Amino acid sequence: MSLRGRFYYCRHFRGRKQARRVGELPEVTELVSGPDWNPNTSQPMPGSPAPAPRRLPGCQRHPHPFKCCPVPAPQSLPSTTRPHLPPTPQGQASRWLFLFLFQKLRGETDVCVPDACRWRRRSRETRGENQSVRAAVRSPDQAFHALVSGSRGREGRLRPQCAGSAGGA
């Protein structure tokens, strides 16, 4: 028996059903079987020998579109907050060094003047000196030079305690 010229029902993309000819659309689903078919319910009339509607073997759409893949566990996803490090035979030292360099590359770690000043502020005799260093420093290179040189001037004497106490220089 040829299906040429027979009508099938296909589900429209908004949920409606439309009668289409065989071979017109890939998602054609059910056969319309003449007077036994109820077009309102897209089912055969009760008591009719018409077959129940079923999908054609050439249908492209999934029979259960609401059943999707399970969501993977968060442990199986790559973490966005920390870099994935395979275990290394060197132990924790290389891991710590890699994390430090990784953070420094991203700009999260700044070995700069504020941390150094916070560390040096514990000693009471250099408190004003640290504040003057922090006010005078403009770049990380200047900060490094100020920390290495001991916050002293070219002549070897201490810098003034604050910006207003400089004499005439």
From Swiss-Prot:
Residues 32-53, 148-169 are annotated as: Disordered. This is Putative uncharacterized protein encoded by LINC01356. It comes from the Eukaryota.
